[in-house]
A protein has these predicted regions:
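Long, compositionally biased stretches
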Residues: 1-67, 87-93, 97-167
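Extended catalytic/binding region for NAD+/ADP-ribose chemistry, centered on the ART fold
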Residues: 69-74
Length: 168
């Protein structure tokens, strides 16, 4: 499938790379088909590019590697539409709100996107747990939690060191 996007130009997306969100995303119910694109910054960031509305794309991450305390329960009826009741079949993503200052980057922990890895069907859940919100700080500046890591900066083929803390 060829899609002419506003952000990435023309994409040739194989059918096995299409994620179908059964009810779309909140506020974008008509947009149900997406694909994941690696971000130039690198992991853990990815772009969730809409195939139905080429100007629509969101930055997402798998929260597991960076937010180890993020756990929630799913009722079988919540994921019935994606045709699984096996936790191992599920991949979770959360939407990222990027900012100029890395300490202002947030993630929506209240609305995770849950995808069945086997058939690429997904749903966006709305969690009612008060400990999760739509603007959870992804990074903090608390020294006791600092983690040093390197990111390849593809534009210049060099490596930069970034010192951040994983919110915990």
């Amino acid at each position: 499938m060829k899609v002419n996007t506003t952000r990435f130009g023309t994409l040739d997306v194989p059918e096995d790379q299409v994620i179908t969100l059964m009810d779309g995303l909140l506020g974008f119910g008509e947009s149900t088909r997406f694909t994941l694109i690696a971000d130039e910054v690198g992991e853990p960031f990815k772009w969730m590019q809409c195939l139905d509305q080429p100007s629509l794309a969101f930055v997402v991450i798998d929260p597991a590697p960076v937010l180890s305390e993020y756990h929630f329960s799913v009722k079988k009826e919540q994921i019935k539409a994606i045709e699984t009741d096996q936790v191992d079949d599920l991949q979770v993503y959360v939407v990222v709100t990027m900012a100029a200052d890395i300490l202002d980057v947030t993630v929506n922990l209240q609305g995770p996107i849950v995808v069945n890895k086997k058939n690429r069907l997904g749903v966006q859940l709305v969690l009612s747990d008060p400990k999760y919100n739509t603007r959870h700080a992804l990074f903090t500046n608390q020294p006791e939690n600092e983690v040093e890591f390197t990111e390849a900066i593809k534009q210049e083929n060099r490596v930069a060191s970034m010192r951040v803390a994983i919110a915990g």
